[in-house]
């Protein structure tokens, strides 16, 4: 299941929409809830990012992201 994570690189400042970035994680989980938990654990362990929101992507959403933006799976 692929998840899109919205985050701020600087966790010492209040989040601002203009500086929100995104990354994509491909996680082997059974449910969306398990994926959100695992994603938060991975990000806490490997980054100092301020995570704003994590959402699972449908196959259609993944195709859209590939066509319109920079789609690259992040691995830790």
Swiss-Prot record:
Enzyme class: transferase
UniProt xrefs under Pfam families: RpoY
Described purpose of this protein according to its UniProt entry: A non-essential component of RNA polymerase (RNAP).
NCBIfam families: PRK13667.1
Disulfide bond residue pairs: none
GO cellular component terms listed in the entry, alphabetical order: DNA-directed RNA polymerase complex
Family, per entry: Belongs to the RNA polymerase subunit epsilon family.
The entry's keywords: DNA-directed RNA polymerase, Nucleotidyltransferase, Transcription, Transferase
InterPro entries in UniProt: RpoY
Source organism per UniProt: Lactococcus lactis subsp. lactis (strain IL1403)
Enzyme Commission number(s) of this protein: 2.7.7.6
GO BP field: DNA-templated transcription
Self-association state and partner proteins as the record states: RNAP is composed of a core of 2 alpha, a beta and a beta' subunit. The core is associated with a delta subunit, and at least one of epsilon or omega. When a sigma factor is associated with the core the holoenzyme is formed, which can initiate transcription.
Annotated protein name in UniProt: DNA-directed RNA polymerase subunit epsilon
Catalytic activity field: RNA(n) + a ribonucleoside 5'-triphosphate = RNA(n+1) + diphosphate
Molecular function per GO: DNA binding; DNA-directed RNA polymerase activity
């Amino acid at each position: 299941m692929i998840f899109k994570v919205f985050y701020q690189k600087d966790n010492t400042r209040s989040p601002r929409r203009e500086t929100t970035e995104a990354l994509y994680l491909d996680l082997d989980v059974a449910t969306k809830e398990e994926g959100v938990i695992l994603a938060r654990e991975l990000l806490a362990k490997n980054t100092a990012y301020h995570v704003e929101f994590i959402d699972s992507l449908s196959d259609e959403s993944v195709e859209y992201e590939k066509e319109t933006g920079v789609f690259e799976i992040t691995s830790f």
